[in-house]
């Protein structure tokens, strides 16, 4: 994998020649100094660097979907990426406050992801949301489901993001800075 960002008529080589393979049930930790490309690598798997101004990464990211179909994330259409993100691959971002919508309740945000990716109706998605909030040990999920992100500490917002990421049972879970 190679990812370059244009900067002042030059290219910054954010990731240069990273290669790894992850099989079902395995855990992989990517470690390195600050600025070494760990987050860029993680974002590349979901093709989120496209939105951050990166040139199209080179290399390939092959993903075996739940139906055993193998796709190359760099050759996948935007429409198919919507299905893959969340349903097959989820990411827990480093800073939950930048990922959670401040004007929507956390319950609605988790439920929407479930309805989009699992096709559940509103009532069943709400039940699944409560189940996920319980799973990540958020106290009083029936109250929390109607609360807004700014009502929570950073650690509780992180748990909300974990609940959302796990809600669709992805095959690959990416955690950016999981220990912060």
At which residue positions do the language-model features occur?
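Hydrophobic anchor residue at the start of the ABC signature
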Residues: 110, 162
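Conserved ABC ATPase signature
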Residues: 147-152, 156
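Catalytic Walker B motif of ABC-type/P-loop ATPase nucleotide-binding domains
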Residues: 173-176
């Amino acid at each position: 994998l190679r990812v370059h960002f244009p900067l002042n008529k030059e290219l910054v080589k954010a990731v240069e020649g990273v290669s790894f393979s992850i099989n079902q049930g395995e855990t992989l930790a990517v470690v390195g100094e600050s600025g070494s490309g760990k987050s860029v690598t993680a974002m590349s798997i979901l093709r989120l660097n496209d939105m951050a101004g990166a040139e199209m990464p080179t290399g390939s990211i092959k993903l075996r979907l739940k139906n055993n179909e193998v796709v190359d994330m760099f050759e996948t259409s935007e429409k198919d990426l919507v299905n893959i993100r969340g349903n097959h691959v989820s990411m827990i971002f480093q800073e939950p406050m930048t990922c959670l919508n401040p004007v929507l309740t956390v319950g609605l945000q988790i439920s929407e992801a479930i309805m989009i990716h699992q096709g559940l109706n509103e009532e069943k998605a709400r039940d699944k949301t409560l189940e996920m909030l319980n799973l990540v040990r958020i106290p009083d999920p029936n109250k929390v489901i109607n609360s807004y992100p700014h009502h929570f500490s950073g650690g509780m917002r992180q748990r909300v993001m974990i609940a959302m990421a796990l809600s669709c049972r992805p095959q690959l879970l990416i955690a950016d800075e999981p220990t912060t």
